[in-house]
From Swiss-Prot:
InterPro entries listed in its UniProt record: NT_2-5OAS_ClassI-CCAase, NT_sf
GO biological process: defense response to virus; nucleotide metabolic process
GO molecular function: 3',3'-cyclic GMP-AMP synthase activity; ATP binding; diadenylate cyclase activity; diguanylate cyclase activity; GTP binding; metal ion binding
Xref: Gene3D superfamilies: Beta Polymerase, domain 2
Family affiliation: Belongs to the CD-NTase family. E01 subfamily.
Protein's UniProt keywords contain rRNA-binding: no
Binding positions for Mg(2+) per the UniProt entry: 61, 63, 136
Record's function text: Cyclic nucleotide synthase (second messenger synthase) of a CBASS antivirus system. CBASS (cyclic oligonucleotide-based antiphage signaling system) provides immunity against bacteriophage. The CD-NTase protein synthesizes cyclic nucleotides in response to infection; these serve as specific second messenger signals. The signals activate a diverse range of effectors, leading to bacterial cell death and thus abortive phage infection. A type I-A(GA) CBASS system. Cyclic dinucleotide synthase that catalyzes the synthesis of 3'3'-cyclic GMP-AMP (cGAMP) from GTP and ATP, and of c-di-AMP and c-di-GMP, that are second messengers for cell signal transduction.
EC number: 2.7.7.-, 2.7.7.85, 2.7.7.65
Cofactor(s) essential for the protein: Mg(2+)
Organism: Elizabethkingia meningoseptica (Chryseobacterium meningosepticum)
Binding site for ATP: 47, 63, 121-122, 136
The protein's name in its UniProt record: Cyclic dipurine nucleotide synthase
Length: 292
């Protein structure tokens, strides 16, 4: 093993208090700018590594979701064809579309942050400065996944990239399920995620892997699917070994993994990630850490 137990413990810790303060400053300032435009028609919350408390790199971006609550997209895939026809015959349209929402969001942010604002493919970016970190603001609508005509199975968010790709996610379920997993594993779930993210950055810096081989989201999902009994209280070295071995063996056996939200399969047509990506990453982590 190339690294001591204490080194793994150090890697498992979240970002510093200073970084957390800069994150809070960004959230407060951006929330005020959005409220000035949209009032209480929106819900504003975090998603991603900062929200899930798995961030490890200094000066990382924070993802701020602005969900417009006065309209929603329906997901009718689980309804019968006859129920879909009934729903579509009765539905009404809000008259406010996503292109307008993103444009209004950009305008609201430019009114406050002026030249610090950049429109990106999937978000509006507010660049950081000495007292706030860079933030990606994601305007979106509510998504309602219907299980029957009268029942909503789950609520998430939906938006479109500027190149017209539909994006659906369930950040609230991701957060709550990840927190539950952490509480059930002696708080080791998120700590193992942080360690693997540190190793990922080191492998990228050393030129061992491409910088887009695995995302933070992908790492969180892989570790989430490791059974709770593989997380050993007070033993980071053994737990990390268990996690890497379990994921590697599962990928060789084509195991079905879910996203942390438990509402999508991890390996599906909606995701560019493959089991081969996970296999390759686990092998690189094993070699880098020096397990035998």
């Amino acid at each position: 093993m190339n690294f001591s137990e204490q080194q793994l413990i150090n890697w498992s810790r979240p970002v510093s208090t200073t970084e957390d303060l800069k994150c809070q400053n960004a959230i407060t300032q951006i929330t005020a700018a959005l409220r000035a435009k949209f009032g209480n028609r929106v819900t504003i919350f975090l998603q991603g590594s900062y929200r899930n408390n798995t961030n490890v790199r200094q000066n990382s971006d924070v993802d701020i979701v602005m969900r417009y609550d006065d309209a929603f997209y329906p997901d009718l895939q689980r309804l019968s064809e006859s129920d879909k026809a009934i729903y579509n015959a009765q539905r009404t349209y809000s008259g406010y579309n996503f292109d307008e929402l993103k444009a209004d969001t950009e305008e609201a942010l430019r009114n406050v942050f002026t030249t610090s604002v950049e429109r990106k493919n999937k978000c509006i970016q507010v660049n950081g400065n000495s007292n706030r970190i860079t933030a990606d603001v994601i305007p979106c609508f509510v998504l309602k996944r219907f299980s029957t005509l009268q029942s909503v199975e789950a609520e998430g968010i939906k938006f479109y990239s500027d190149d017209n790709k539909e994006i659906i996610s369930f950040p609230e379920q991701h957060y709550s399920n990840g927190t539950e997993k952490t509480n059930q594993t002696y708080r080791l779930y998120k700590r193992m995620v942080r360690i693997l993210k540190v190793v990922n950055y080191r492998l990228i810096d050393d030129g061992e892997i491409a910088d887009n081989l695995v995302s933070s989201f992908f790492i969180e999902c892989l570790v989430y699917n490791v059974p709770n009994n593989q997380f050993i209280s007070g033993n980071y070295t053994q737990t990390l070994r268990n996690v890497i071995v379990k994921i590697y063996e599962d990928m060789k056996n084509n195991a079905d993994y879910t996203e942390v939200n438990r509402l999508f399969w991890l390996f599906s047509n909606r995701s560019p990630r493959t089991r081969q990506d996970a296999l390759g990453f686990m092998q690189k982590c094993w070699n880098y850490l020096g397990y035998q």
